[in-house]
């Protein structure tokens, strides 16, 4: 059976379109007493963006810290904070930031209408109730979080997304002006998340004409951005992220993302840089992609951390392997239905020990 997947309902793209946010939200406000919750990356606390957020009356602005990978405990605490502040639910959650902030905003919008801990919903299609209205506004591009049906969280036992049609944003605003000032390394790592999405999707067993069309376009845009120059590179990167996210919506990612989840869960390494660390050792699986990736790192003077796993305690290494192996759809996409015969625990251990 073919997948009938949920897409973002409304999209605005263009330089300066952030200024339309107030008007978009006005149509969603139920009364003068209702409120919106803006969840904004705390790196913007002393920036001009702070003054552009259209906070009204009883609206709440929550500064979200993503120094660490998003955790279920943090999502649960933010959800409780909002519930404690009012007897009514907000009219909407607006996530403004990179992939981690957008994932947190998506998770909170789900947990406001679903009971228990967000850890209970890590997996596929476990969410029972529709989320409240939620909007995504990226200030970094590459993760595809603005269009994905997942919100990736580290829980007590595993790093895994809340994968659900209810997770998908109702509205996104793609304003290239918002990503213009990103630090060089962070921009690169996040952009490579998109590039690696595309390589894994285009080389996967789940590939189809839908995912191929979006994946090839996103891959081409990534090459223009990171192997070329141009005044519209922010626009291209933002659209690459969108198209890359759409590509994996109808296929899957692969080996790099599975191994990166293990690094992130055990060592706390952020997703973008984690993908880059892992991908550099996957030439046997994605030879052309890794060669181009290394060309990009050299061109942008990126120096990846080394020897992260050297000397790590054996129980932590085994936990990395456990976390990676949970992600069965990723392995099947990369290696086929017989992937367990190809990617053994010992093979994964060998790959991690190189990093």
Language-model segments: which ranges?
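ATP/NTP phosphate-donor binding region
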Residues: 1-92
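C-terminal charged capping/lid subdomain of soluble metabolic enzymes
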Residues: 6, 294-355
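Short glycine/serine/threonine-rich phosphate/pyrophosphate-binding segments
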Residues: 18-22, 45-49, 100-106, 144-147, ...
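Glycine/threonine-rich beta-strand-loop-alpha-helix active-site module
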Residues: 73-81, 87-177
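Glycine-rich phosphate/pyrophosphate-binding beta-alpha loops
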Residues: 142, 245-270
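Carboxylate- and glycine-rich phosphate/diphosphate-binding segment that chelates Mg2+/Mn2+
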Residues: 151-250
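Catalytic phosphate/nucleotide-handling subdomain of diverse soluble enzymes
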Residues: 261-300
């Amino acid at each position: 059976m073919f997948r009938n997947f949920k897409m973002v309902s409304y999209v605005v793209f263009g330089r300066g379109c952030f200024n339309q946010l107030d008007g978009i939200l006005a149509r969603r406000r139920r009364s003068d007493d209702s409120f919106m919750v803006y969840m904004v990356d705390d790196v913007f606390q002393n920036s001009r963006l702070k003054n552009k957020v259209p906070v009204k009356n009883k609206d709440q602005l929550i500064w979200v810290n993503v120094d660490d990978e998003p955790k279920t405990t943090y999502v649960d605490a933010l959800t409780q904070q909002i519930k404690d502040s009012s007897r009514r639910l907000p009219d909407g959650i607006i996530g403004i930031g990179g992939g981690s902030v957008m994932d947190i905003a998506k998770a909170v919008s789900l947990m406001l209408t679903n009971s228990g801990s967000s850890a209970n919903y890590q997996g596929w299609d476990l969410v029972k109730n529709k989320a409240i209205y939620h909007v995504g506004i990226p200030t970094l591009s590459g993760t595809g979080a603005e269009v994905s049906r997942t919100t990736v969280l580290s829980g007590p036992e595993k790093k895994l997304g809340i994968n659900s049609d209810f997770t998908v944003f109702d509205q996104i605003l793609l304003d290239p002006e918002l990503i213009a000032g990103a630090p060089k390394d962070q921009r690169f790592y996040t952009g490579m998340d998109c590039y690696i999405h595309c390589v894994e999707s285009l080389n996967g067993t789940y590939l189809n004409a839908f995912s191929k069309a979006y994946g090839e376009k996103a891959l081409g845009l990534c090459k223009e951005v990171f192997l070329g120059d141009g005044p519209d590179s922010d626009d291209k990167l933002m659209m690459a992220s969108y198209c890359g996210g759409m590509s994996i919506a109808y296929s899957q990612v692969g080996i790099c993302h599975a191994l990166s989840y293990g690094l992130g869960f055990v060592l706390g390494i952020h997703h973008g840089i984690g993908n880059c660390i892992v991908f550099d050792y996957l030439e046997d699986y994605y030879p052309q992609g890794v060669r181009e990736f290394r060309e990009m790192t050299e061109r942008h003077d990126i120096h990846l951390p080394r020897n992260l796993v050297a000397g790590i305690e054996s129980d932590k290494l085994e936990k990395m392997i456990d976390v990676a192996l949970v992600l069965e759809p990723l392995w099947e996409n990369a290696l086929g239905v017989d992937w367990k015969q190809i990617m053994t625990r010992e093979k994964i251990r060998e790959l991690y020990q190189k990093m």
